[in-house]
Amino acid sequence: MAKLLYVTCNLKPTEFSCSLSVGKKFLDEYLRQNPADEVYFLDLYRDNIQRIDADVLSGWGKMRNGESFASLTTDEQRKVGHIWKHADQFIAADKYVFVTPMFNLGFPAELKMYIDAVCVVGKTFAYTPTGPVGLLKDQGRKCLHIHSSGGFHFGKEEDHSVPYLKSIMGFMGIEDFESIVVEGVDAIPDRAESFKGAAVEKARGVASQF
């Protein structure tokens, strides 16, 4: 029995979102194929994600200098503990699905905040004399990114969404990465349903092997 962490970052209702609607079709097929697996849902707009702020940096700095977690201020403990909670949840999963829209050639800031919360030295990566090393190379972990954009950007230099997520997953040791991209729905609106339909078919195929 595997644990799937399903992370969404979209303000639209599912029926009005290309990425969420494709994600739902993926999840329906995945659960049909893997009914015993555990799925954990994280909505980055709804759920409170702790950003890295002055208290977090101060707390981390104190602990690097040998101070205990118990010696941190109340705010430092609360905020660092919140980040650790998300990092531990991420580590506990075997599979990851991120469902996002494109915002200005990237993705919403809430996803970057979440990535900062799970990329924690000593938990998901470590520094070595030869460079950083991902600590999540075990368990055959895999990641799927379901992403949508109004224009055509995937595979181009200006795309800072899918390539970044693939890179940061690899940074933590998760090398098995796949993407499903719905694009062009605003650029060619009369073909939007065709674009979404193709993505749904791909999502169902990926779900059967994920």
From Swiss-Prot:
FMN binds at residues 17-19, 148-151. Homodimer. It is an enzyme of class 1 (oxidoreductase). It comes from the Bacteria. Belongs to the azoreductase type 1 family. InterPro entries: Flavodoxin_fold (IPR003680), Flavoprotein-like_sf (IPR029039), FMN-dep_NADH:Q_OxRdtase_AzoR1 (IPR050104), NADH:quinone_OxRdtase_FMN_depd (IPR023048). This is FMN-dependent NADH:quinone oxidoreductase. It catalyses: 2 a quinone + NADH + H(+) = 2 a 1,4-benzosemiquinone + NAD(+); N,N-dimethyl-1,4-phenylenediamine + anthranilate + 2 NAD(+) = 2-(4-dimethylaminophenyl)diazenylbenzoate + 2 NADH + 2 H(+).
